[in-house]
């Protein structure tokens, strides 16, 4: 079912309104054909954008995805938009030279990471590359040079950041065009609603991407007092709208005037359908606030 692609910014990439996240793919225990079938099912629903990072699965997920994608016909591969991230260096078997987890936003690392992602994913271009986390040692001019080199080489079309504060975003945006800030946001993590993150993006007409829209599942199954309060509100509103509680959680995000683009992290196609159902629901202010309170 084709879904209209949506722009993250005036000159930004066009992504599906819900993005499929591959973060946990290494834990799914699937062979390449099963991974390909998941990609196909996502695309059949109109979800053609996939969110990655070099570090996912201990530096293994991009290669798992690429192995599956290599089995796909070109007609499918050409429909997909691939997002990846770089800038975190984990202690991992695949990176024995890393003594501690740290950040690296040097031009050399950004370029090398993007090129490694392209090889692992078996694609020629990333639609969007994000700096994964703020780096206290980030030289904004150096990052801008790396972005321009990757853009000029045709290896990355657009650039953004993830988990940046408004001041950090403003600094890097003063040197190079940014098209999104991918942040954590849900009814249990509401800081971006008050710390200026969403206000800044709305002012710039740049849409945020949202990771962990269901709080890692806590919005549906968490046992804490706050989790249960939100679950009860979601259930009441879902009953009124005749949909799943997860659908209301996504609709709560989509109601925001900054027009977020959520990343669904589930391997379950039914969970993706529930996220997509939110595109047909507009919560009124009372419903939205009922989840907030």
Regions found by a protein language model. Name each.
Residues 9-27, 83-101, 125, 130:
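N-terminal small/glycine-rich loop or linker at the start of catalytic domains
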Residues 9-14, 44, 68-81, 118-122, ...:
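Acidic (Asp/Glu)-rich catalytic clusters
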Residues 29-42, 105-121, 165-169:
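Short, acidic/polar
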Residues 118-137:
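Active-site groove signature of glycoside hydrolases
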Residues 30-37, 60, 64, 98-109, ...:
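Alpha-helix N-cap and loop-to-helix initiation/capping positions
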Residues 1-81:
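N-terminal binding-site loop/beta-alpha segment at the start of enzyme catalytic domains
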Residues 47, 123-126, 156, 178:
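A structural motif
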Residues 134-293:
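Beta/alpha (TIM)-barrel catalytic core signal, keyed to glycine-rich beta->alpha loops juxtaposed to Asp/Glu
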């Amino acid at each position: 079912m084709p879904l209209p692609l949506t722009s993250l910014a005036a000159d930004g990439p066009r992504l599906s309104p819900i993005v499929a996240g591959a973060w946990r793919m290494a834990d799914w225990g699937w062979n390449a054909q099963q991974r390909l079938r998941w990609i196909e099912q996502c695309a059949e629903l109109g979800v053609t954008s996939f969110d990655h990072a070099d570090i996912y699965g201990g530096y293994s997920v991009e290669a798992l995805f690429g192995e599956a994608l290599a089995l796909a016909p070109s007609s499918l591969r050409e429909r997909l938009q691939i997002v990846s991230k770089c800038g975190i260096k984990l202690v991992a078997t695949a990176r024995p030279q890393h003594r501690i987890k740290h950040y690296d936003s040097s031009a050399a690392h950004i370029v090398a990471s993007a090129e490694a992602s392209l090889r692992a994913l078996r694609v020629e271009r990333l639609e969007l590359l994000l700096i994964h986390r703020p780096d206290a040692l980030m030289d904004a001019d150096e990052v801008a040079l790396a972005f321009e080199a990757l853009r000029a080489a045709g290896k990355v079309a657009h650039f953004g950041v993830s988990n940046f504060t408004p001041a950090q975003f403003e600094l890097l945006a003063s040197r190079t065009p940014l098209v999104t800030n991918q942040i954590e946001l849900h009814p249990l993590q509401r800081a971006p609603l008050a710390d200026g993150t969403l206000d800044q993006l709305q002012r710039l007409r740049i849409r945020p991407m949202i990771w962990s829209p269901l709080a890692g599942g806590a919005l549906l199954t968490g046992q804490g007092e706050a989790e249960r309060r939100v679950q009860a509100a979601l259930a009441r509103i879902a009953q009124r709208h005749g949909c799943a509680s997860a659908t209301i959680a996504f609709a709560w995000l989509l109601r925001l005037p900054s027009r977020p683009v959520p990343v669904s992290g589930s391997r379950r196609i039914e969970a993706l359908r529930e996220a997509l159902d939110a595109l047909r629901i507009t919560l009124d202010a009372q419903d939205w606030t009922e989840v907030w309170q």
